[in-house]
C-alpha cells in the first residue's frame, strides 16, 4: 500500500468504528476467496460487513476513535466484522467459524464493552432483538385473546356455565 493511500484506509476504518457499535475481530488465514465471498454475502444480507485490515492502520483508527482497548487484538491476518445488530452478526460469524476452521474469532467490542471469544459465542446464543420483541408482544396479547375467546363463545355455552355455577350454590 502506498503511503498516500494509508490515510484514506485509516479514515475508512475510523468510519466503520464510528458507525458500527458492534465489531468482531477475526483471523482469516487459510480461507479461500469463495469462502470469504460467501461470508460477505451472508453478512450483507444482515446489514453487516467484513473487511480485511492492516493491523497498524486498524490500531491507528482504534486510537483515533477511543477504542484503545481493542488495539492489542490486531495481530496476524486480521479482518473485522461490523454491524449495528450484534446478536445477528455474532450468530453468523460463530456459525461460519464452526463450519470453517480457518476463521478464528479473536475478540470484539459491543457498545464499548470489550468481548473475548467466549463472550461472543455466548452472545450468539441470545435471541435477536426482533425475536425478543415478538415474544413480548405475544405474551402481552395472550391474556387478551383468552378473554375475547370466552366472550365470543356461543350464548348457550355461557348460559350453561352460569347455570352450573347457580346449581352449585
From Swiss-Prot:
Pfam family, one: Ribosomal_L10
Protein name per the record: Large ribosomal subunit protein uL10
PROSITE patterns attached to this UniProt entry: RIBOSOMAL_L10
NCBIfam families named among the record's database cross-references: PRK00099.1-1 (NF000955)
Quaternary structure note: Part of the ribosomal stalk of the 50S ribosomal subunit. The N-terminus interacts with L11 and the large rRNA to form the base of the stalk. The C-terminus forms an elongated spine to which L12 dimers bind in a sequential fashion forming a multimeric L10(L12)X complex.
GO biological process, one term: translation
Organism per entry: Rickettsia massiliae (strain Mtu5)
GO molecular function, one term: structural constituent of ribosome
Record's keyword terms, sorted: Ribonucleoprotein, Ribosomal protein, RNA-binding, rRNA-binding
Keyword Ribosomal protein in record: yes
Family: Belongs to the universal ribosomal protein uL10 family.
Keyword Flavoprotein included in the entry's annotation: no
